[in-house]
Amino acid sequence: MTKRITKVCIPTAGSGKRLKYLTKEINKSLIDINYKPAISYIIEKFPSNSEFIIPLGHKGEIVKNFLKIAYPKKKFIFVKVKNFDGIGSGLGLSLLKAKKFLKTPFIFVSCDTLFEGSIPNLKKNWVGYSSTKNNGQYRGIEFNNRNEIIKFHKKSFKSSKFKKTYI
């Protein structure tokens, strides 16, 4: 029997430049949405036995302190990402820094992704995505005509009928 995936990676290292003044003093994962930080909506979607890998960068100590205080019974592994802005920074670097904790199947969720419904009982590779007309500000997925993923795109990719925005 295949075990359910319980490891969750939520990178929070980025500086959130597109949010401008909102992220000057706080990490984008902690921006309040209806009186609750965005990252809380994500963490609360997962079962109590989940292990969270959190790459930290911009205002990382604030994120770390918040999570330890708000969720004292949750298991967190914090990974420091020093180069979180500028040349060589980005999501790929955050995942590389967390690599030693991600040697088993895991669920990746961007720190500012909000979604309805529950997390499926995942036992194998899976990607959640959404269609959007204004997809230039998001990363994207390109599918072939058999609905198989053939490429992940950086932000500002050109849209086509086989491309979707992933979460």
Task: Give short role names for the model-derived ranges.
Residues L114-I167:
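Conserved core of the sugar-phosphate nucleotidyltransferase
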Residues H58-G60, D112-F115:
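Short, polar loop motifs at secondary-structure junctions
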Residues T12-K17, E25:
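N-terminal beta1-alpha1 ligand-phosphate binding loop
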Residues Y21-K24, K28-I31:
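Glycine-rich phosphate-binding "P-loop"
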Residues T104-L114:
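Short beta-strand-to-loop acidic/aromatic patch adjacent to the donor-nucleotide binding site
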Residues T2-I10, R18, D32, K36-F106:
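Conserved N-terminal catalytic core of the sugar/cofactor nucleotidyltransferase
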Residues K20-Y21, V63-F66, G117-P120, Y138:
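Short glycine-/acidic-enriched loop or helix-start segments at secondary-structure transitions
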Residues T12, L56, S110, S130:
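Short beta-strand/turn micro-motifs composed of small residues
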